[in-house]
Amino acid sequence: MTRPAASGVSRKLAMSTEPSSTGHTPPLDRLEKVQVVSRLLKQAPPGEFSEAFSDLRALVKDDGMMYEEAPGFCAIHTKDHFTPMEAEDFKVLLTRHNELEENRFLDPEGQVSFKYDHLKREPTDFQAHPEEDEGGELWRRELYKSLEAYVNNHYPKGTCSVFIKDTAVRRILVACIESHRHKASAFWNGLWKSEWTFALTPASTSTEVTGSITVQAHYFENGNVHLSVTRDVEETLLVTDEAQTARDFAKLVEKAENQVQNGLMEEYRKMNNTHMKSFRRQLPVTHTTLDWEKIVTGKIVEARAIL
């Protein structure tokens, strides 16, 4: 199985090999290489970080830099893609929102923290991390319960996490959803993720929810087709008690994600009738495909009549 190199990589890195007006080759310095590689690896399709890293390694021709910076590159990819981490008794998304310090993450459901090796994809050094704000934890737990029910009903393999950040005047709740399908054997990979944030103050009767929904897909059998869609959402959420607000929030997320999915399906339908039309053979004047089964059946009937 072959896979195309990362789009635009060779063009950008070719700058280091093209002669300048003075006849000399201006090489990229280390910092420039790190910046270029980091930017391109952030665009790596879901489930293809290792392949993109190998492509870039061959183009950069600086193994020392690549392997020294690999943990940092991988950490960015892990957090950007809301990578799920599953251990014996818990499952949590790895994001920038629950990174307590470099490479140490919090699982609010299990109330533990752990170190994570992004290259080996292994958690270690588990430590108890109880939530001190009991009132805030009640909001977070109810939100997680409603969101988990939504994810279980709408995703074949989905994961969600809810995090809380306390400030002097308000609580900030962040909810993340991730679902991926990696089918390299069938030449495609895909990811759906969304992130939702809103704040609560003691006198809150409503709050503004901001969300971002991202869909990525890559199909690479005899070609190289990328899909990358991001939709931003802003909605008002009524704040009552913890349980009701959590249920209303889950309904808000469901409505927004359904709109994105339906919009994508409508775009595919339009593309099928417009952009993709030129790639197909023309239909007969009836604008219907031939019913070969009906034709074959008719010939069998005719043959029997003759006999």
Kindly give the residue locations of the regions a language model identified.
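Generic hydrophobic, helix-prone segments enriched in Leu/Val/Ile
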Residues: 70-74, 84, 192-202, 246-253
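Extended interaction regions within the primary functional domain
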Residues: 135, 179, 232-236
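Short stretches within intrinsically disordered, low-complexity N-terminal or propeptide regions
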Residues: 7-8, 213
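Generic signature of intrinsically disordered, low-complexity, basic-rich segments
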Residues: 1-2, 10
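Short secondary-structure boundary motifs at beta->alpha junctions and helix caps
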Residues: 222-271
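Context-dependent free N-terminus signature
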Residues: 2-3, 16
